[in-house]
């Protein structure tokens, strides 16, 4: 067998082909190392806390509650409704910033949205929600637009506030002792 035939055989043999091609996601190189992956704790009350960002998230989103998409104004009303009800005992629920929404996202995490598509948020969040969230950030030069964050791609985008095909995942700031397990507090006591 000639060298050319041998090269052809090697190149066309499926056992010799590298079938572990890597999928490169847009923006994936910007996300950094594994230590930046969100670390979530299920609080057992319909909320999840991210110990890295000190944010508390509602486990489900507006789609799980209503069954349809909402516009930015309805997302604001949704936060207000949760605050009036004192959901999980708190009255300071709000839309996240773009950076806060991004902090819940990681390519190493996997969940599914309402259509069964993969989203990159912790499996501790309820599956079957929307694939994006409104943020509180308004476009500076054109206030009829607000920022959305995609949990599929990790991208931020500007969307008209009247767009009803978006969803809302709410958050709040937490002080560490609000959700820190009792056993952890005890282990932090040092004697001299």
Would you name each region that the model predicts?
Residues 48, 60-63, 96, 102-103, ...:
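Generic hydrophobic/packing signal
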Residues 2-93, 165-171, 178-191:
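Extracellular adhesion/carbohydrate-recognition regions
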Residues 71, 76-92, 98-148, 159:
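An exposed tryptophan-centered "aromatic clamp" motif
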Residues 10, 137, 141-183:
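Solvent-exposed, polar surface segments
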């Amino acid at each position: 067998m000639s060298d050319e035939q041998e090269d052809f055989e090697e190149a066309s043999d499926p056992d010799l082909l590298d079938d572990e091609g890597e999928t490169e996601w847009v923006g994936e190189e910007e996300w950094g190392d594994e230590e930046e992956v969100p670390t979530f704790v299920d609080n057992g009350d319909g909320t999840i806390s991210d110990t890295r960002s000190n944010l508390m998230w509602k486990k489900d989103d507006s789609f799980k509650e209503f069954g349809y998409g909402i516009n930015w104004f309805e997302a604001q009303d949704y936060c207000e409704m949760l605050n009036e009800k004192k959901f999980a005992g708190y009255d300071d629920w709000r839309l996240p910033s773009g950076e806060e929404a991004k902090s819940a996202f990681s390519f190493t995490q996997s969940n599914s949205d309402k259509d069964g598509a993969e989203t990159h948020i912790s499996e501790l969040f309820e599956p079957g929600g929307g694939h994006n969230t409104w943020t509180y950030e308004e476009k500076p030069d054109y206030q009829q637009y607000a920022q959305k964050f995609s949990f599929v791609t990790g991208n931020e985008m500007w969307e008209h506030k009247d767009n009803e095909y978006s969803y809302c995942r709410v958050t709040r700031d937490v002080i560490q002792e609000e959700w820190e397990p009792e056993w952890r507090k005890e282990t932090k006591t040092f004697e001299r």
